[in-house]
């Protein structure tokens, strides 16, 4: 199950969360290494925030990772479910008339 997660941190001075921002990337690295954050797809947004592409087996697994992320940097999270390229191609080829 693919999800694009977009974080918008709560308003604070960037200098007040610098250490936590570093902790977020340290937390994410093992997930990137294990392809839970797919294709090394975690990027900082211009200004503040980050995006990540999660590949998980359940909503519960995603919820666990989001909860861990929020413990490091409190934020509003936008979660967008996605279809894989394989599923998209199969859907399109099955529905061609």
Regions found by a protein language model. Name each.
Residues 1-97:
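Conserved, structured core segments of small domains
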């Amino acid at each position: 199950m693919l999800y694009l997660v977009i974080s918008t941190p709560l308003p604070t001075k960037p200098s007040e969360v610098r250490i936590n921002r570093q902790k977020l990337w340290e937390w994410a690295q093992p997930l990137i290494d294990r392809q839970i954050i797919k294709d090394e797809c975690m990027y900082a947004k211009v200004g503040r925030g980050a995006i990540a592409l999660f590949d998980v087996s359940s909503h519960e697994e995603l919820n666990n990772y989001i909860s861990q992320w929020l413990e490091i940097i409190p934020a509003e999270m936008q979660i967008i479910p996605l279809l894989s390229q394989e599923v998209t191609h199969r859907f399109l080829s099955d529905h061609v008339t």
